[in-house]
Amino acid sequence: MFKFNDEKGQLKCSFCGKTQTQVRKLVAGPGVYICDECIELCTEIVQEELAKDEEVEFKDVPKPVEIREILDEYVIGQDSAKKALAVAVYNHYKRINSNSKIDDVELAKSNIALIGPTGSGKTLLAQTLARILNVPFAIADATSLTEAGYVGEDVENILLKLIQAADYDVEKAEKGIIYIDEIDKVARKSENPSITRDVSGEGVQQALLKILEGTVASVPPQGGRKHPHQEFIQIDTTNILFICGGAFDGIEPIIKRRLGEKVIGFGSEKKNADVNEKHVLSHVLPEDLLRFGLIPEFIGRLPVIANLEPLDEDALVDILTKPKNALVKQFQKLLELDDVELEFEEGALIEIAKKAIERKTGARGLRSIIEGLMLDVMFELPSRKDIEKCILTKETVADNEPPKLVLQDGTVLDTKTSA
C-alpha cells in the first residue's frame, strides 16, 4: 500500500497532513487519503454554498421595478403586461418566503393568464421571468392534454417536464414556473355545461384545477400513463407559479358586446366609440373568459389577467434591433464568424416588419422571413474569402432582389451573376 514519507511510515491525510493515529478515520482513494475531520469540513462548505444559492434564488427576489427593467432588455413594448407580471411574480415568491402565512393570514397563489395574439411575446415573457429568478421552467402545450383515461397526455406530464428541467431535484422544481400555452384551445364549446364528455376541453380544465390550486401530485418518472405497479415522484404544486397563455381568437366580439358596442347592425351608432380596435383586449374581464368557454373554477385559479397588444410596425422594427438577443444581432454574429459584416438598411427592416404583419405571425415570423432572405447568401459566403460586407436593402425584402455583396476592394458584386 502507498505510504507517505514520514519517519514512522504512517499514512497521512492528503489535505491536513494528520497521521492515521491523530484522526478517527482515514478514507483511502487511489493514492490519496482524507480524514474524517476534513470530510466533515468539506460537507459544511458544500452545505453553506448550497444554502447560499438557495438564498440568492428565493430570498433576494428582485423588486417589481427591477423585474420590469430586465424584461425591457429582452421584450419590446407590452408595458401593461410587464407591470402585471412583475407584481404577480414578486408577490408569488414573497408569499413562498413567508411560508404562505403572515400573522395567521394565508396568502393565496397568484397564477397568471396571458392573453394576446400569436407572436406578441407571451412565451418569451415567461421564459425571461424564469431566467431572472433562476428557477426551473417548463413549457407545456394544452392541446396535447386530455382528461385522465383518454388518449393523450395526462396533466401530470406537465409536472414531469418541470422536474426534468430541475434535474430531478423535486424541492427545486416545487418553486419553479410552468407556462401552459394554447390554453384557449381547451375552452368548452359553449358557455353552458354539456352533458356529453369534452375530454380535450372542459375535461382538461377540470384536470388542471388541482395542480393550479396546489396539491401533492403523483408523477410517473418516465412519463406516459399511470399504472398501479410503478413508482411515482411526489411533488407539491402549492408554490409552483402557473402562467397560462393563449391568443383567445374570437374574444374581442365578446368584450365589445359587454362594453355595449354593436358588433353587427346598420344605422346604429356605437355606444362606446372610445374603444380602440387595437386595445380591445385591455378591457378583458373574467366574465369574458367565462363566455369564451373557460369554466368558473378555472378562471378563479387565474386571478391575474395580463393582456398583450398586437405588435405594430415600429414595435417589430424595435424587436429586430434593440433587445440583447435581437435577430439582427444574431445574424450579424453568424456572418461575423465567416469574417463578413452584415448590414440591414432601415428600409429593409420596415419591409420585414410589414411582411410579418401581413402574415399575422407577429414577432414569431420575423426569423423565418430573414432566414428566407439570407438563405442563398449564407450558402455561398463560407466558400468565398473575398466578400467583406453583405447589405440587405428595401428591394431585397420587397422585390426579392439579392442582397448587395461588397468585395474587399470596395466593389459591389451583383449576386445574380456571382454564382
Curated annotation (Swiss-Prot):
Residues binding Zn(2+): C13, C16, C35, C38
GO cellular component: HslUV protease complex
CDD domains: RecA-like_ClpX (cd19497)
A single MF term (Gene Ontology): ATP hydrolysis activity
Pfam families linked to this entry: AAA_2, ClpB_D2-small, zf-C4_ClpX
SUPFAM superfamilies in the record: Glucocorticoid receptor-like (DNA-binding domain), P-loop containing nucleoside triphosphate hydrolases
Job description of the protein: ATP-dependent specificity component of the Clp protease. It directs the protease to specific substrates. Can perform chaperone functions in the absence of ClpP.
Entry annotated with the keyword Chaperone: yes
Binding of ATP, residues: P117, T118, G119, S120, G121, K122, T123, L124
InterPro entries noted in UniProt: AAA+_ATPase (IPR003593), ATP-dep_Clp_protease_ClpX (IPR050052), ATPase_AAA_core (IPR003959), Clp_ATPase_C (IPR019489), Clp_protease_ATP-bd_su_ClpX (IPR004487), ClpX_bact (IPR046425), P-loop_NTPase (IPR027417), Znf_CppX_C4 (IPR010603)
Keyword field contains Plastid: no
Stretches that traverse the bilayer: none
Protein name according to UniProt: ATP-dependent Clp protease ATP-binding subunit ClpX
Complex formation: Component of the ClpX-ClpP complex. Forms a hexameric ring that, in the presence of ATP, binds to fourteen ClpP subunits assembled into a disk-like structure with a central cavity, resembling the structure of eukaryotic proteasomes.
Keywords for this protein: ATP-binding, Chaperone, Metal-binding, Nucleotide-binding, Zinc
Family: Belongs to the ClpX chaperone family.
Domain ClpX-type ZB: start-end pairs: 1-54
Gene Ontology BP annotations: cell division; proteolysis involved in protein catabolic process
